[in-house]
Amino acid sequence: MVKIVDTTFRDAQQSLIATRMRTEDMLPIAEKMDEVGFYSMEVWGGATFDACIRYLNEDPWERLRALKKRIQNTPLQMLLRGQNLVGYRHYPDDIVEKFVIKAHENGIDIFRIFDALNDVRNMETAIKTAKKVGAEVQGAICYTISPVHTIDQYVELAKKLEEMGCDSICIKDMAGLLTPYEGYELVKRLKEEISLPIDVHSHCTSGLAPMTYLKVIEAGADMVDCAISPFAMGTSQPPTESIVVALKGTKYDTGLDLKLLNEIRDYFMKVREKYKMLFSPISQIVDARVLVYQVPGGMLSNLVSQLKEQGALDKFEEVLQEIPRVRKDLGYPPLVTPTSQIVGTQAVLNVLTEERYKIITNEVVNYVKGFYGKPPAPINPELLKRVLDEGEKPITCRPADLLPPEWEKVKKEAEEKGIVKKEEDILTYALYPQIAVKFLRGELKAEPIPKEKDIGKILEIPTEYIVEVDGEKFEVKIEPKIGTELKRKKEVITAEMEGAVTSPFRGMVTKIKVKEGDKVKKGDVIVVLEAMKMEHPIESPVEGTVERILIDEGDAVNVGDVIMIIK
């Protein structure tokens, strides 16, 4: 008998609609899903935490509690990025411990824990803490293909995870690269050499996943990850209903009720209709190019979202071609959060700036320095030269060993900002300090769900007005203007002005590193922008003096906005 892990509330919607499903769409069907008999339901972790506060104006902790209240029989599962938790950097051990404890208290029964580089040192603290609180731990192995990845390596990794106390092993095939026969060999070897249950997680991006599931089940896989059909296929998982029928009447029969699954499917068809404008054609089709570019499902939908945000969706093909080049430069990391974000964002910047590594993200710098762990293969020497100072070498210890405790510090900061109502708020602030302050103060609004535009309806906006001021009438004509203007104190600053420094992309100002009157050299970091979930240092294009600073920390800027005048 094969068991099914349901991913509809987490990875499925993350892969297809960039994690925009609201809690209000989950709760009405949660109790019925609890009746199905899934091995577990993956409902939290991954990008859901970030999306809740950044886009949906929802408290992710409250979502978890609400789901736990309605799902009493099925274990709730989350995806935890090891030392990265649900963020995009390494957090110190005290934050990791506190997060795991609180996640368990709020309803998580099973922690699926992975490290993007398969560096088990980055999984140690999370595994130990989850075991300590009595949760089930599933150690996940990120599957990828490259000149340096082999079945033998994956088997050795699984043995290490078994020794560390994991209760089961997950083959996490985030890009849909696992072929049916390679999957068969991998699972067969694992069943021969370790004694833990095996779960296989894949995506349909390349079209291989349903076939691969049948072969890994034949090889002895105990569980497979599936999604209810309206949120299946494309960059998501295989459909639950199809897998249930495929195995019916065999020794692998799941025992799940197809009638009940179809009732759940009918509900999600309505949910799908609500979000239909978020379903990108790119993430819904089978795209065998993934076998070349190795872009995971969640990364693909986020890539589309990021390029739309930057007004550069026409660069999609170029970015797809750049991703494998950046991945090779970085030593072939598996493309899963946060490395998918690190590689993907750097590839986007390389294309948008029309020069490779003209802007290098802080995350790439930290990755190259070893702060994310040990890469599977050596990093491109040219990139090492650009990132490392003379005589500097990447670290070789467990990255978290270099991180001082943060809990007391972030607790004090959060309390001073007046944003703490419960202990979980401190963790939210620790993970996402910039966005959390606005969220916890109630300053954010949920982004609207895109609606289908009325076809054929033309909205006419007048372009000429008569304006009366103190009895005198003026004729005003409004025309679209190419380029970006930023008005400050009744004057207009344009990108054409001498010394104007413009934003290379759309984002939020997180740090201003200079003051008016400061002298800067070409290449000095003047501003840090957060865009595409990463922080990007913006360098001065010239040597000179900072005459004007036209932005404040927390401001949103668009591509081409003038942010400073440096002469």
Curated annotation (Swiss-Prot):
Q: Which reaction does it catalyse?
A: hydrogencarbonate + pyruvate + ATP = oxaloacetate + ADP + phosphate + H(+)
GO MF entries: ATP binding; metal ion binding; oxaloacetate decarboxylase activity; pyruvate carboxylase activity
Determine if Metal-binding is one of this entry's keywords. Answer: yes
Please name the InterPro entries in this protein's record: Aldolase_TIM, Biotin_BS, Biotin_lipoyl, Carboxylase_cons_dom, OadA, PCB-like, PYR_CT, Single_hybrid_motif
Looking at the record, the residues that make up the Pyruvate carboxyltransferase domain are: 2-262
Q: In which pathway does it act?
A: Carbohydrate biosynthesis; gluconeogenesis
Uppermost EC category: ligase
Question: Has the keyword Calcium been applied to this entry?
Answer: no
Known cofactor(s): Mg(2+); Mn(2+); Co(2+)
Detail which positions bind substrate: 10-14, 81, 337
User: According to its UniProt entry, what is the function of this protein?
Assistant: Pyruvate carboxylase catalyzes a 2-step reaction, involving the ATP-dependent carboxylation of the covalently attached biotin in the first step and the transfer of the carboxyl group to pyruvate in the second.
Q: Assembly and partners?
A: Heterooctamer of four A and four B subunits.
Q: Which protein are we looking at?
A: Pyruvate carboxylase subunit B
Origin organism is Methanocaldococcus jannaschii (strain ATCC 43067 / DSM 2661 / JAL-1 / JCM 10045 / NBRC 100440) (Methanococcus jannaschii)
